[in-house]
Amino acid sequence: MAESLQNPEEYLPLTPAVFNILLALADGEKHGYGIMLEVEANTKGQVLMGPGTLYGSIKRMLQAGLIEESDERADPEMDDPRRRAYYRLTALGRRMLRMEAERLASQVQIAKTKNILATDFSRGAT
């Protein structure tokens, strides 16, 4: 992905795993387990990301330049080389996240205009 990002739209749609990881990192850096917890919270438990999916996706996202490993330690006292790796969005990752969120919002708007989505969920409409 990193070689030819002259036209990032070519890489949309993002996979659900990549989208959820980018979304989890949107408000700051996190370690892998923190990302898994954030994805679970953001999706109200509907998406449970296991370590294989998470770290496979992280590896590809690092190579693509969507995220980077943080050089900073969350706790300066942690000088143990076995410390957890922390990840953060790059400018490209934030741009791709925004583009995908806009694409998804457009799809939701279409569903609304076709009366697929209930406008008042408190009434239990379907």
Where are these regions (language model features)?
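A generic structural micro-feature
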Residues: 13, 79-83
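Beta-hairpin "wing" of winged helix-turn-helix
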Residues: 64-80, 88
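N-terminal helix-turn-helix DNA-binding core of bacterial DNA-binding proteins
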Residues: 9-53
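Short, Lys/Arg-enriched N-terminal segment that forms or immediately precedes the first helix
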Residues: 1-10
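Amphipathic alpha-helical dimerization/coiled-coil segments
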Residues: 2, 92-126
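Basic amphipathic alpha-helical segments that dock to polyanions
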Residues: 54-61
